[in-house]
C-alpha cells in the first residue's frame, strides 16, 4: 500500500510541477504578448501622430495655397480696375479738352488720317460746335499744300460717336474716334500704364 501511496504522491508532485511550469510559461507568454502589444500601441500612436501631422501640414499648405491664389486674384482684379479707370480717365480728358485744344488735336488728326483729302467726315452731334466749317477750311488749305484734294466735308450720316471722328471715302473708312483709338492701342499702352501705376 505504501508503494501505491508513494507512486500517487510522485504523480501528484510531477503534476503540480508541470502545472506550475505551465502557469509560469503562460504568465511569461502573457507578459511578452502584453509588452509586444504595448510596443505596437506606442508605434501605432507614433505613426498615427506622424500621419496626422502630415495631413495637417498638407491641409495647411492647401489652405495657404488657396489663400495666396485668392490674394493674387484680388490683386489682379484691383490692378485691372485701376488700368480700366486710367483709360476711362484718358478718354474723359480727351472729351473735355478746351475747345481750342480739342480743335487743334482734331486738326492734326485729320491731316494725319486723310488719304487723298477727298473724304467725308462723320462727327457726333456734341462735337459739331467744336469741329466747325472753319476748322475744315483750315484742314483743306493744309491738305492742298500737301498736294491733296483739300475737299474734306461734313457727312450727313449720323453715328454713335463720343469723340473724335470717322473719315469716309467711296472705298474706305478710317475710324479716328477716341474710344476706338484707345481700344486699338490699349494692349500696347496697358503694359506702360501698368508699369507707371504699379512700379515699386
Curated annotation (Swiss-Prot):
InterPro entries: ATPase_E_C, ATPase_V1_Esu. The keyword Transport applies. GO terms for molecular function: ATP binding; proton-transporting ATP synthase activity, rotational mechanism; proton-transporting ATPase activity, rotational mechanism. Gene3D superfamilies: ATP synthase, E subunit, C-terminal, F1F0 ATP synthase subunit B, membrane domain. GO terms for cellular component: proton-transporting two-sector ATPase complex, catalytic domain. Pfam families: vATP-synt_E (PF01991). The keyword Ion transport applies. GO terms for biological process: proton motive force-driven plasma membrane ATP synthesis. Keywords: ATP synthesis, Hydrogen ion transport, Ion transport, Transport. Produces ATP from ADP in the presence of a proton gradient across the membrane. Belongs to the V-ATPase E subunit family. HAMAP family: ATP_synth_E_arch. This is V-type proton ATPase subunit E. It comes from Thermoanaerobacter sp. (strain X514). The lineage of its organism: Bacteria, Bacillati, Bacillota, Clostridia, Thermoanaerobacterales.
